[in-house]
């Protein structure tokens, strides 16, 4: 390679800094901003790009979905749907969740039913189960967002992958197996959250990440979209009227939603070497699709793109608060300020040795960092302990980021690339004190990392002198008001404005089941054998998200079918992915209000930016906020990846990490706090070992809770093992 060619390659790569991101840099070990490496390394990166397998530095920053792309993708989906005789609704989003098009085919069902028992299994009552007035447009958007948010340049996951990893057993259909690695992730990106953004409408995109109307979807029929190996968005289709999941993956399904949505990916395919079906966890291979494109009945390349008006196949459909039907929208380029994800300001995050870290942040519409490091807003220990300082938050983020850039990823390809994650730090009020992310972490991890951090802090508040104890906070929240199925939902959908509320009033809210949030407090205290657990007067206990997740499984220990449920979970026969327990019950009423807001075109006000505390569909107190828990504003999360932060024996905050394997997330949070404490001369620390949840002796000789679990040999640049032992 000539010197001029070397310079050209280096210049090209430097332009990629703000682009899609992910994977390794040359040897895969650098924690620094990319610099000009050897010509051999740089040539290798470009060759990888030409193979369609990006490693994070192989596309220009302008890579995005154009209007023509979106029109073609939707046209391909419609052609396959027509060929199979299943009219439906299709949605396309960009990588940060801007809705670019929603198309409703002629004859498509307008509403869908949420159910986990469409396979003929015994139906579950309560939660979201049986709710049958969900607009199909919202289901299609949720599917598209899921395909986009779970995928990166290192992995391509679909809604079928999501179905596999959120159920009570991994794999679904097996018995006496632990739950899915992302158990509970379906209740993230919630429309009532405070981190996710809200669309402005009018055919304009705005900074993300955006909220999803139904959280993340486990219903097959949602896929990521790629251009030149770079993820640029997602596509979702629903036509069968069921918003469900696959409860048994021992066979391959003939799910028409899935094959029809798959048609939209032709020409925008995920690289085969990045798809879920080449990625494993605990020795099991993920699923991407139960079809392949050879099963398509149509030639997608020759499919007619949709037109904005006078399309005989159907029409663009307005979705209040998400999409205006007057135009097809161009997507944003991920990693640029317009997307809401941008390189961290120069000098913001540095390693312990002073080298600048390759980090990204969330930015607002002006390009300013939304969550720069700041001091805590709380008064830890009844005001006797200093809150986290801004410089301490910065060091925590730096140490966590350094660890991520050293660690071997679990769910990325090629093998040997770095973990890619989002990192949130909060105080005891749940206020965000700082946020950072690696170059190509999956988009879902931003909101989830914040959920995780807040969850660890909240459940570690026993005996910490916090103004309102966890128990008192939960007791003050209104009960979820579960909806019953309505009679003739399609007739209701023909005139939502006049028929929806009367139809709901006939049977809703359900009188059984009708849990109270306070029930979970009582159940937790009994299960733990600690009458004052979660109380202001109780003895301090520290709960990582792995610990709280143990308590939130339908079996304890996790996966043992003959055992009872954890205290924060529904019992057998009442539990499903759509009715999990405390996690959903905290946010249920806000979800329903948001659906009503969209369905009735704004006649019902939209939810605020705090999910818990909504009175729900209560005719006497309709959708009011009561005793809201702002410290859990975007809901709780129940899979691992967070720890509380202490100053001595006093709780001062928490850190949450999400985006890679859950053991990696655990280690980055736990070891990140430890390393930050060392760097800050022990000014902060992990929870004292004696008060960690794994020290609680449970009644009836039940196995102990878990606190964190770190990978055995985690580093790319060292064979050091058991790095969390003894800390």
What does each model-identified segment do?
Residues 9-13, 42-43:
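Terminal low-complexity, poorly structured segments
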């Amino acid at each position: 390679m000539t010197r001029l060619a070397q310079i050209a390659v280096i210049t090209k790569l430097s332009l990629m800094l703000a682009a899609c991101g992910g994977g390794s840099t040359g040897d895969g070990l650098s924690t620094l901003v990319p610099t000009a490496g050897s010509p051999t390394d740089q040539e290798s990166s470009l060759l990888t790009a030409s193979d369609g397998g990006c490693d994070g530095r192989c596309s220009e920053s302008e890579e995005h979905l154009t209007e023509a792309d979106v029109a073609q993708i939707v046209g391909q989906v419609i052609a396959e749907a027509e060929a199979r005789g299943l009219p439906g609704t299709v949605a396309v989003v960009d990588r940060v969740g801007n809705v670019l098009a929603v198309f409703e085919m002629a004859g498509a069902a307008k509403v869908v039913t949420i159910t986990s028992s469409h396979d003929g299994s015994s139906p579950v009552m309560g939660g979201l189960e049986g709710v049958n007035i969900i607009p199909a447009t919202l289901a299609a958007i949720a599917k598209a967002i899921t395909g986009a948010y779970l995928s990166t340049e290192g992995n391509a996951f679909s809604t079928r992958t999501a179905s596999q990893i959120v159920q009570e057993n991994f794999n679904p259909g097996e018995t006496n197996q632990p739950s899915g690695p992302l158990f509970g992730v379906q209740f993230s990106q919630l429309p009532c959250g405070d981190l996710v953004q809200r669309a402005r409408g009018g055919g304009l995109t705005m900074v993300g990440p955006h909220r999803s109307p139904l959280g993340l979807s486990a219903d097959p029929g949602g896929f990521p979209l790629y251009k030149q190996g770079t993820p640029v968005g997602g596509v979702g289709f629903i036509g069968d009227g069921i918003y469900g999941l696959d409860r048994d993956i021992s066979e391959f399904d003939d799910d028409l939603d899935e094959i029809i949505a798959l048609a939209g990916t032709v020409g925008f395919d995920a690289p085969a070497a990045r798809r879920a079906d080449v990625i494993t966890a605990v020795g099991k291979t993920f699923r991407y699709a139960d079809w392949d494109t050879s099963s398509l009945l149509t030639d997608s390349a020759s499919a007619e793109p949709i037109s904005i008006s006078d399309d005989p196949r159907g029409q663009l459909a307005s979705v209040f608060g998400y999409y205006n039907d007057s135009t097809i929208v161009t997507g944003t380029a991920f990693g640029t300020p317009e997307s809401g994800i941008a390189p961290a300001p120069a000098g913001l995050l540095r390693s312990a040795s002073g080298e600048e870290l390759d980090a990204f942040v969330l930015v607002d519409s002006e390009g300013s960092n939304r969550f720069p490091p700041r001091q805590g807003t709380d008064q830890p220990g009844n005001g006797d302990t200093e809150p986290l300082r801004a410089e301490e938050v910065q060091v925590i983020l730096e140490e966590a980021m350094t660890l991520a850039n050293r660690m071997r990823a679990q769910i990325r390809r090629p093998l040997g690339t770095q973990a890619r994650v989002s990192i949130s730090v909060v105080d005891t009020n749940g206020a965000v004190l700082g946020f950072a992310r690696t170059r190509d972490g999956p988009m879902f991890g931003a909101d989830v990392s914040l959920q995780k951090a807040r969850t660890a802090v909240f459940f570690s508040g026993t005996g910490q002198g916090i103004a309102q104890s966890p128990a008192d906070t939960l007791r003050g929240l209104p009960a979820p008001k579960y909806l019953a199925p309505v009679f003739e939902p399609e007739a209701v959908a023909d005139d939502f404005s006049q028929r929806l509320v009367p139809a709901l009033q006939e049977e809703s809210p359900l009188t059984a089941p009708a849990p109270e949030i306070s029930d979970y407090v009582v159940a937790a205290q009994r299960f733990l054998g600690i009458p004052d657990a979660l109380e202001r007067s109780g003895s301090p206990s520290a709960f990582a998200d792995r610990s709280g997740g143990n308590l939130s499984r339908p079996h304890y220990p996790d996966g043992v079918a003959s055992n009872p449920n954890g205290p924060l979970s529904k019992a057998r026969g009442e539990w499903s992915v759509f009715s999990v327990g405390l996690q959903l019950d905290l946010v249920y009423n806000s979800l329903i209000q948001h659906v009503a807001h969209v369905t009735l075109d704004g006649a019902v006000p939209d939810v605020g930016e705090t999910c818990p505390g909504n009175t729900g569909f209560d005719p006497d107190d309709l959708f009011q906020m009561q005793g809201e828990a702002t410290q859990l504003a975007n809901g709780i999360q129940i899979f691992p990846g967070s720890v509380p932060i202490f100053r001595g024996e006093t709780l001062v905050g928490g850190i949450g990490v999400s985006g890679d394997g859950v053991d990696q997330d655990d280690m980055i949070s736990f070891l990140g706090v430890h390393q930050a404490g060392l760097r800050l001369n022990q000014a902060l620390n992990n929870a004292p070992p004696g008060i960690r949840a794994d020290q609680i002796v449970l009644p009836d000789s039940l196995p102990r809770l878990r606190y964190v679990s770190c990978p055995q040999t985690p580093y790319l640049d060292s064979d050091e093992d058991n790095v969390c032992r003894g800390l």
